[in-house]
Amino acid sequence: MAVSKEDVLEFISGLSVLELSELVKEFEEKFGVSAQPVAVAGGAVAAVEAVEEKTEFDVIIVDSGDKKINVIKEIRAITGLGLKEAKDAAEQTPSTIKEGISKADAEAFKAQLEAAGAKVEVK
């Protein structure tokens, strides 16, 4: 009596992960093949690239922290706002400091504000 594909699949489905790993290694040795993933075809790469990466980011202060004066100074340096506007932005959190900027700029502004003591999000 010959063993069918269904019998083989049923047997394999009953194996543990360790047993499956050993079985794969034995297949590789016996048949001289590798179980490495096959390279993705060109059409699939195009589909992955079709997913747009976000290009515009907003810098939002979630909390000014204990060092509000330093945070206000950084807000003024980043935005060019006057003292009152920068103070309002620091005190009325969450507040958006910059909108529609590049990821590099957003990360740089985030680092500046966090160094001054603020908790910042980039969205």
Curated annotation (Swiss-Prot):
Q: Which GO terms describe its molecular function?
A: mRNA binding; structural constituent of ribosome
Keywords from UniProt, A to Z, are: Ribonucleoprotein, Ribosomal protein
Its cellular-component GO annotations read:
cytosolic large ribosomal subunit
The keyword Ribosomal protein is annotated on this UniProt entry? yes
What is said about its interaction partners and assembly? Homodimer. Part of the ribosomal stalk of the 50S ribosomal subunit. Forms a multimeric L10(L12)X complex, where L10 forms an elongated spine to which 2 to 4 L12 dimers bind in a sequential fashion. Binds GTP-bound translation factors.
Q: What does this protein do?
A: Forms part of the ribosomal stalk which helps the ribosome interact with GTP-bound translation factors. Is thus essential for accurate translation.
Query: NCBIfam families under this entry?
Result: L12 (TIGR00855)
Q: Which family does it belong to?
A: Belongs to the bacterial ribosomal protein bL12 family.
The identity of this protein, by name, is Large ribosomal subunit protein bL12
Gene responsible for this protein: rplL
